[in-house]
């Protein structure tokens, strides 16, 4: 896997007397991170700001947009108010009202979720709502691919949309 960061550094240096475990090592505006696997781009994370904490190996990001790619094309996108990126594993966790929209307009909404790039899956332990062209599913807990094609939802209630055949 590859990882690339870009952004503009904030000119303000952290206060010398501050607790350095709670003070970001760097603050980047217009943050962008690209992730690749076997030379092919798998995700791009864009955020208005990233606060990097080097000692803890993570970055907190504001208004993250996470683009997922399959075979070189965008397959879905995630949008959230807040997120955190593990800088060593590239795992992304988002919260505050998360939405994932796939290329076929399937839409997943939940309060919090996590993307694991090692297995290329999205996970959530929270209540989830999934709207597909032919159905609506609500439940607690989720495991899915970023394209929202292979989805496992716990404690689910599903409804077929009117006018759709099975």
Description of each model-found segment:
Residues 1-166:
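Mature-chain termini and adjacent capping regions
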């Amino acid at each position: 896997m590859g990882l690339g960061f870009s952004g503009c550094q904030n000119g303000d240096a952290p206060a010398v007397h501050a607790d350095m475990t709670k003070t970001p090592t760097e603050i980047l505006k217009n943050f962008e991170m690209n992730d690749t696997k076997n030379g092919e781009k798998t995700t791009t994370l864009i955020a208005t700001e990233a606060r990097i904490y080097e000692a803890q190996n993570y970055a907190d990001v504001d208004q993250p947009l996470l683009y997922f790619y399959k075979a070189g094309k965008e397959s879905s996108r995630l949008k959230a108010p807040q997120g955190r990126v593990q800088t060593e594993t590239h795992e992304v966790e988002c919260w505050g009202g998360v939405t994932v929209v796939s290329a076929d307009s399937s839409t997943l909404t939940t309060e919090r979720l996590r993307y694991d790039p090692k297995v290329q899956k999205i996970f959530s332990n929270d209540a989830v709502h999934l709207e597909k062209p032919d159905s609506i599913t609500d439940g607690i807990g989720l495991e899915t691919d970023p394209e929202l094609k292979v989805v496992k939802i716990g404690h689910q209630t599903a409804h077929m949309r009117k006018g759709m055949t099975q």
